[in-house]
């Protein structure tokens, strides 16, 4: 009994001398947590803890940065801190009050690398445009084209048939990119083939679609920004139901149908619409352009669609841009003197020659024509691989040619 008493007194004397005030037997150890536990440097986080000295001031330490906090009567605290900008990897966060401390880890994530912005739209007089599989809403496709070409397209093709509502969301998407929409408005039902009597030219001129045409005119007028309207294109061929000689259409039917549609849209107040008359490049057997031209008062821009099919088809052979477009451009100049000329669709296959050389000549030839205002590349893998990047050499050649015409 005496020995036990002496030991107890000795221990009590030792505690007093040391000045240490340990937690009561069985008290939980200090703990600290951080929320969230991961994020980039510079993140605002909350550090909280329990089991610390009560009602006192403490410090949170993160690297060389310190943050003050005060504990509650129960030894708890919560403090907002910022992870230092230079922190990396697993960063230790320590909280302490006098002799009590505890630590946790914050995992610093690498800041995401921002996606590179696509190149800007060129202000060169020869505009570069594109049509892609996904159309105006396919931002990734348009960004890809911009990066391939070294500049963002200033014209973006949109295709709509007579059953569809005005594509206002698509127009907005194109405008947001700093480009102008080129709407190809096709008076038929997609997928229905050439023989569609309900969409014959005389039915259009007779007013069967006036409600839809007026709806478009009003919507485009309300939209208010510039839009190019390529109505009933490639009419000198025989593969669409609005061509003369097919679908019950007679010679002379095309012009009244065009003029009727034009007048309804204009009457709706859509003065922001530029009308683009866009035949196919003339070929043996195609309908003569003179009988299809609606007149200077009904057309703002004349255009051509033309492709180098190379040897991809049994009926085709390699043709360079000057030979492909030269005769048609000459006809347009005679038929519509003073009108700007647009190549509204073009591309080349790889089969039968050098696509790289073709791309280079296309840009240099068109840039040398003072009345040609632009061209639109058909960036699709369809009947042939028309894509700009069907090969590395093709993509490089077009990019370099566009750069040269800007120099």
Model-identified regions with their sequence ranges:
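Extracytoplasmic/secretory-pathway segments with low complexity and glycosylation-like composition
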Residues: 1-113
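Boundary/entry segment of secreted carbohydrate-active catalytic domains
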Residues: 111-164
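Aromatic- and acid-rich polysaccharide-binding/catalytic face
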Residues: 156-159, 289-320, 378-380
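Glycoside hydrolase catalytic-domain groove-lining segments
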Residues: 169-186, 304-351
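Substrate-binding cleft of extracellular glycoside hydrolase catalytic domains
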Residues: 169-273, 277
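Aromatic-lined carbohydrate-recognition surfaces of secreted/lumenal glycan-active proteins
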Residues: 258, 262-288, 338-351, 374-380
């Amino acid at each position: 009994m005496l020995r036990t008493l002496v030991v107890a007194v000795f221990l009590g004397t030792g505690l007093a001398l040391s000045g240490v005030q340990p937690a009561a037997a069985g008290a939980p150890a200090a703990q600290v947590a951080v929320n969230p536990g991961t994020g980039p440097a510079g993140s605002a986080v909350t550090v909280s803890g329990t089991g610390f000295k009560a009602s006192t001031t403490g410090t949170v330490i993160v690297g060389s940065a310190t943050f003050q906090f005060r504990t509650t009567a129960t030894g708890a605290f919560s403090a907002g801190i910022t992870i230092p900008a230079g922190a990396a990897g697993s960063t230790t966060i320590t909280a302490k009050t006098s002799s009590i401390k505890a630590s946790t880890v914050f995992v610093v994530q690498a800041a995401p690398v921002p996606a590179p912005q696509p190149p800007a739209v060129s202000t060169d007089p020869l505009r570069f445009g594109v049509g892609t599989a996904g159309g105006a809403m396919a931002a990734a496709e348009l960004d890809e084209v911009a990066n391939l070409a070294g500049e963002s397209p200033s014209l973006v093709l949109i295709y709509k048939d007579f059953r569809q509502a005005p594509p206002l969301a698509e127009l907005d998407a194109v405008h947001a990119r700093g480009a102008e929409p080129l709407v190809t408005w096709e008076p038929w039902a997609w997928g229905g083939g050439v023989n569609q009597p309900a969409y014959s030219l005389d039915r259009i001129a007779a007013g069967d679609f006036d409600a839809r045409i007026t709806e478009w005119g009003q919507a485009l007028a309300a939209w208010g920004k510039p839009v190019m309207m390529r109505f009933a294109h490639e009419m000198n061929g025989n593969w669409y139901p609005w061509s003369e000689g097919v679908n019950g259409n007679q010679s002379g039917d095309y012009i009244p149908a065009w003029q009727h549609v034009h007048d309804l849209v204009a009457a709706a107040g859509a003065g922001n619409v530029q009308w683009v008359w866009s035949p196919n490049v003339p070929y043996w057997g195609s309908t003569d352009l003179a009988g299809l031209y609606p007149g200077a008062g009904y057309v703002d821009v004349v255009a051509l669609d033309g492709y180098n099919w190379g040897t991809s088809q049994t009926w085709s052979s390699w043709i360079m841009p000057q030979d492909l477009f030269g005769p048609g451009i000459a006809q347009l100049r005679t038929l519509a003197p003073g009108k700007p000329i647009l190549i509204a669709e073009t591309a080349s296959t790889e089969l039968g020659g050098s696509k790289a050389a073709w791309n280079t000549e296309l840009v240099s030839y068109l840039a040398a024509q003072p009345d040609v205002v632009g061209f639109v590349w058909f960036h699709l893998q369809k009947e042939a691989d028309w894509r700009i990047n069907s090969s590395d050499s093709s993509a490089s050649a077009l990019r370099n040619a566009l750069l040269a015409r800007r120099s």
